[in-house]
Swiss-Prot record:
Involved in copper homeostasis. This is Copper homeostasis protein cutC homolog. Gene3D superfamilies: Copper homeostasis (CutC) domain. Belongs to the CutC family. The keyword Transit peptide does not apply. Pfam families: CutC. The keyword Membrane does not apply. One of its GO terms (molecular function) is copper ion binding. Keywords: Copper. It comes from Drosophila melanogaster.
Length: 263
């Protein structure tokens, strides 16, 4: 039986990796920002300077990603955890409103000890467990959600064990129906204006996560300096289009979410 959606505003968390994208997220009406760096790598820990600059202007909550390097194993050494916890302390001292973290063992089970260290270091700020969850054993998903809640995580970001939330929406609906009373399961990955209504309808989520990207972003102004045509690049991203959060895309998503909230 599908649970009826209660009368509430469905919240949009926008994932950003730049100051300009953060401003676009707020302009579009997002409820919260997940701040990271290197979104093209799946999102890494942001810089203190970026957080401080955004906090000086924006009033919306900012959750900071805690991820010391690229890679989808999410198996961290003691040294990597030491660096991560140091970053966490500095981010908290400079205004972070929450954190996003995930850690696994080599067998892809959740690394409970490392999770406890992060939750203890959070100082009571909310912590989201990210899509590392989607690499765990799907057969144990309910037990793992219960464990995350008992550890102290406030929410889970998941694509339902599939590449995108649209692909995994049926699994997400199951998780949400079972755990939403005391834990937030937040769909994310590949959510677009074109598939948002279906994802909200099927999943019955209270929150969702998107980057609302557009090539160069809505208000991007190209540098006035002339870029010489040459073969020198600073990395793969230099040869790809520059993507940023588009406030118009955010606004469209918020409008859809509000319409769905009133149903």
């Amino acid at each position: 039986m599908i649970r009826e959606m209660s009368n509430h505003d469905i919240k949009l968390e926008v994932c950003v990796d730049s100051i300009r994208s953060a401003f676009a997220a707020e302009e579009g009406g997002a409820s919260r920002i997940e701040l990271c760096s290197a979104l093209g790598e799946g999102g890494l820990t942001p810089s203190i300077g970026t957080l401080k600059t955004i906090k000086e202007t924006l009033t919306m909550p900012i959750y900071c990603m805690l991820r010391p390097r690229r890679g989808t194993d999410f198996v961290y050494s003691d040294e990597e955890m030491c660096a991560l916890l140091t970053d966490m302390d500095l981010l908290r001292e400079n205004g972070a409103d929450g954190f996003v973290f995930g850690s696994l063992n080599p067998d892809r089970s959740i690394n409970v000890d490392q999770c406890r260290h992060v939750l203890l270091a959070s100082g009571g700020l909310p912590v989201t467990f990210h899509r590392a969850f989607d690499l765990t054993d799907q057969k144990s998903m309910d037990e793992n959600v219960d464990m995350l809640r008992e550890l102290g995580f406030r929410r889970l970001l998941s694509s339902g064990f599939r590449p995108t939330a649209a692909d995994g929406v049926d699994c997400l609906a199951q998780l949400i129906a079972k755990h939403q009373r005391d834990f937030i399961v937040m769909p994310g990955a590949g959510i677009k204006v074109s598939n948002l209504e279906e994802i909200l309808t099927v999943s019955r989520c209270l929150e969702f996560h998107a980057s609302a990207l557009d090539t160069a972003g809505e208000d991007y102004v190209a540098p006035t300096t002339t870029r010489m045509e040459c073969d020198v690049t600073m990395g793969k991203q230099d040869v790809d289009p520059y993507y940023g959060t588009n406030s118009i895309v955010v606004r469209k998503m918020v409008t859809i979410a509000k319409a769905m909230s009133s149903r």
